[in-house]
Amino acid sequence: MFSSRWKKELGFGWNWIYNSEIIQSVSDNPEGPYQFLRVILPRRGRAYFDGMNTHNTCIRYFNGKFYLYYMGTSYGGEIPQGEETSPERNLEVWNRKRIGVAVADSIYGEFVRRERPLLSPRDCSHWDCTITTNPAVAILPGGKTYLVYKSRCAVGEPLMLGVAVAEQPDGVFQRLSDEPILSFDDPDFHVEDPFLWYDAERKKFCLLAKDDSKNGSRGITGEWGSGFYAESDDCLHFEISDAPKVYSRYLNWKDGHQTRQGNMERPWILFDDTGKPDYLFCASGTGENPYSFQGRTFIVAQKMCLK
């Protein structure tokens, strides 16, 4: 498993853009427990776009190599040590999020990073002029690679998803369209945390993403923070399912009790040996209110039931 972490004593706050690092853990089965193995992408210096912080992993395999896609940031000034950071500084660093890739010959080998982002924001005439983040990748059998990413045009504007394509997994990526892949008439319909895969049998691009609706909007699913499903023939024109909700913030545990989680972030699917979705993983934590974690955060694994 590839995930991200930072020191518990720092609290949650905005440390996912200041103090996060990507790690690797191992387990004998999908449900765990997982044992920490090593840090994959530590800090490497302020001169790099990802030199101070790495987060939001997406691991893929193709033709003998492992491709680890991620979001990175760099920033000047002091490294936050648990104190509250100003909204102005948070926004400055948030706007420096960029997608990168690191490549290894073995899942246990050295992951080598690029010096430059895999995909950068465009100029201010476009909807994705602020950031590129939350990478979701599908590699087709011939190596053609589709990259779904999150961005927005300004503070308070809708979070939306775009798509870029390359002839090989490490680029060069070019956007498929000037417009986002999902857009809504209601400005309170925000989407983020995509997970993308290609169903070769059905020749469909499949998308799982988080309903991040704002201002009390019912959003796509009717439940903030839940996940919805959409699919496409070309990874550009997506149709949201008639029954879109894939997962909820309500969890039913093996001992029979139910909890409402504050967050279910960064959905990730593990496939079985036949290529069918098997387990859904999400980042979560203790506490019922969004982003108000009480004590600890963790990763949840849920066995999937296909309909």
What spans do the regions from the language model cover?
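Carbohydrate-active catalytic/glycan-binding domains of CAZyme proteins
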Residues: 1-307
